[in-house]
Amino acid sequence: MLWTLPVCLLSLSFSAHIAAVSIQHLSTGHDHDDVDVGEQQKDISEINSAAGLNLFQGDILLPRTRNALRDPSSRWKLPIPYILADNLDLNAKGAILNAFEMFRLKSCVDFKPYEGESSYIIFQQFSGCWSMVGDQHVGQNISIGEGCDYKAIIEHEILHALGFFHEQSRTDRDDYVNIWWNEIMTDYEHNFNTYDDKTITDLNTPYDYESLMHYGPFSFNKNETIPTITTKIPEFNAIIGQRLDFSATDLTRLNRMYNCTRTHTLLDHCAFEKTNICGMIQGTRDDADWVHEDSSQPGQVDHTLVGRCKAAGYFMYFNTSSGVTGEVALLESRILYPKRKQQCLQFFYKMTGSPADRLLIWVRRDDNTGNVCQLAKIQTFQGDSDHNWKIAHVTLNEEKKFRYVFQGTKGDPGNSDGGIYLDDITLTETPCPTGVWTIRNISQVLENTVKGDRLVSPRFYNSEGYGFGVTLYPNGRITSNSGYLGLAFHLYSGDNDVILEWPVENRQAIMTILDQEPDARNRMSLSLMFTTSKYQTSSAINGSVIWDRPTKVGVYDKDCDCFRSIDWGWGQAISHQMLMRRNFLKDDTLIIFVDFKDLTHLRQTEVPIPSRSVIPRGLLLQGQEPLALGDSRIAMMEESLPRRLDQRQPSRPKRSVENTGPMEDHNWPQYFRDPCDPNPCQNEGTCVNVKGMASCRCVSGHAFFYTGERCQAMHVHGSLLGLLIGCITALIFLTFITFSNTYQKLRQ
């Protein structure tokens, strides 16, 4: 059994819906003997440089005749077909599906499983993280290599495939950032080139320091402490290269490019900042009304702006301090039309009146006659006299049009000096998080802790019955760099352990530090995820699998009266500087979501690709100029990867996206060789790369055309041939008549 270090406990108060937690102060000079935490997340440039890749702009596999952002034919037809190749790590598959959900939540871009389409994306695990730009009108790869399986990195590569280049490639780049050319690695200078408006477009948006497509300050640097790119406004140096999520400008460009007018999974959102309260209505059969109030009164602080702005910051309020016990007020949403069968209603609330007050959530459903009037009670929240805003999640399962309804009920007006508050409502067609951990007074926690100190969450259960939790290191581990917050996952013993499978494998742990931005489309939350495996062992438990039964490999935790396994996560999950930005710490509160999902069904996802000759429209872009690269050393299709890429490539035959013929082992030099260089087509035929095979487009004129695999056979058009035969026949006839007439004259 593991030895434990002495701790002293500092009590903190948290939201009523979670158990009490304590800060565990570790003895100086000791690290956690029962912790196995990964390194800080690496960026794309680091991953690809370590893999020996020297791609265009660092992570773009560039065809020779594609001008993606300016070329309308490079826009994808939605939804985009995709394949998850079986050489992908299981965690990468889950992360890709998670990234898809972000696109669906924040744009009209959608994805569908491949069903034989000519254009599709296949996600594979090669060396590094890279993509092509735009729809190539044939199957194309996105590489999610080792270390690339983070939501933000995957979103970055998908944005390339959708048609976007890097932010610092803009024509006006030098107005906003400085490039330190002497600090760039030799042969990597091309990654910092800019391109004119004929090549890329900014879609009429300003330069975006916060873009997910921007390089970080230390990209491709010679010296790890000296940046290659800095911002002319110094405050943005810590922002460029963020790998949290899409920026607001990223989404503006994406939605403009694909003409999005709405998203797929966001059904409703309301921060109550407008007088029309987002189309919500007061009930007509209740006793009182919800009141639309602002933050101007003392103690009346909204959640959206937390009282930071005068004459702004609105919320809905139901006063429970007067009237009669049992009086109710109803607040109903507009009629909503779901596309999926599950929704998550998230909102912030507080109940400052009597503990007997209640907040009920109802849905009003279609009664099969077209009227939305059939009521069903979903969940009840009891008063707690807590003056702090709390987050709540309610799962709905609506398949027809409906309304959601908030009912406030007065419990004991005589003992109430407040009421019920509502703010920042979001309804999405996504699952609700399994576990929600709220940590209050986070600034005090950061100030009163040192490296190695930790907070442990209460126990949560997933749908299978596994108990789990999160460990927060406010100032990182003892071995971490200063100024970072660490985050790790662990298992708890629970009531269901006897019947559960151990060790628990193929489950993805997802930990999310919530950006409490009221509009879900603009949230830039940090999501970290990994998948459990039998190969994840620790010497601290004699080489046993970390994910075995906690009573077998864990240590006793008196806070939960249960056993807790070794932590697994990140010692430097997010910097304090980034944490202080945006809305991560709204109202001095940190909120962490945690899920534990079974990915076993994703172990085999690859589907066969039929071998066929396809002539995709728009693949041959005649008259267009290739990108002006200016450096022959820049990697292109046939020279983008080293001869020996990755020892971890699967040895069994795989069907590659660029070669859908017979099954064969990946031959990397051939795999990326351009089959049209040199041109195998004769008689001025044009060669087109179709799934890695040379396909000739033969010249056709008014009189002649060429056929054959290499355009080697010439033919005459049938109409012309008939005309020629007729002309020749007429000529012979005329010649015969002329000869006959001449002969008759000579005889006379």
Swiss-Prot record:
Pfam families attached to this UniProt entry: Astacin, EGF, MAM, MATH_2
Superkingdom of this protein's organism: Eukaryota
Cysteine pairs bridged by disulfides in the record: C108-C260, C129-C148, C270-C432, C676-C687, C681-C696, C698-C711
Residues the record marks as active site: E157
Gene Ontology MF terms in the entry: metallodipeptidase activity; metalloendopeptidase activity; metallopeptidase activity; zinc ion binding
Parts of the chain on the Extracellular side: 67-719
EGF-like domain: residues covered: 672-712
CDD domains: EGF_CA, MAM
Domain Peptidase M12A positions: 67-261
Chain spans, region Disordered: 641-668
GO cellular component, as recorded: membrane; meprin A complex; plasma membrane
Activity regulation field: Inhibited by actinonin.
Topology with respect to the bilayer: Single-pass type I membrane protein
Cofactor note: Binds 1 zinc ion per subunit.
TM ranges: 720-739
Protein EC: 3.4.24.18
Signal peptide (UniProt feature, chain positions): 1-20
Subunit details: Homotetramer consisting of disulfide-linked alpha subunits, homooligomer consisting of disulfide-linked alpha subunit homodimers, or heterotetramer of two alpha and two beta subunits formed by non-covalent association of two disulfide-linked heterodimers. Interacts with MBL2 through its carbohydrate moiety. This interaction may inhibit its catalytic activity.
Name of the molecule in the record: Meprin A subunit alpha
MATH domain location: 435-596
Compartments reported by the entry: Membrane
Record-annotated MAM domain positions: 265-434
Lineage: Eukaryota, Metazoa, Chordata, Craniata, Vertebrata
Maturation propeptide residues: 21-66
Cofactor requirements of the protein: Zn(2+)
Glycosylation sites: N141, N223, N259, N319, N441, N542
Topology, Cytoplasmic side: 740-748
